[in-house]
Amino acid sequence: AAGLAALLKYPARFAGKKVGLVLGGGNIDPLLLASIIERGMVRAGRLARIKVSARDIPGSLAKITATVADAGANINEVHHQRAFTMLSAQNVEIELVIQTRGRDHIAQVLATLNAAGFAAAEQP
């Protein structure tokens, strides 16, 4: 902040010069910084939330996670929802937060899941 203050107070001194300001993070709350980075990853398509519908049978979750891994994405979070869904009683809704390489990669992961027999879609 001191560098910016000097620039604002003495603009004539820096006129016509290329000036760079160094910002330090000593007073930035780490949780706020983490939140900013995470939201930036979402906007860049590097972090996505997807919903996958599947039969609620042993091995379904393992097949879903293996399919995501085979598509080259990393799973950050898993939320397995049985009760609060409009799906039939034999099905389950699984919400995943995944790390990807970008928007095209998200589409690739979804296509791979759908090709494997799951109903998968990106969530806002």
Where are these regions (language model features)?
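Short loop segments at secondary-structure junctions
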Residues: 9-12, 26, 101
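Short beta-strand segments
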Residues: 21-24
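Short glycine-rich anion-binding loops that position phosphate/pyrophosphate groups of nucleotides
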Residues: 1-2, 26-28
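A conserved regulatory-domain signal marking ACT and ACT-like small-molecule sensing domains
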Residues: 30-124
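Context-gated lysine
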Residues: 9, 17-18, 51, 63
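Active-site-adjacent helical/loop segments in soluble small-molecule enzymes
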Residues: 1-17
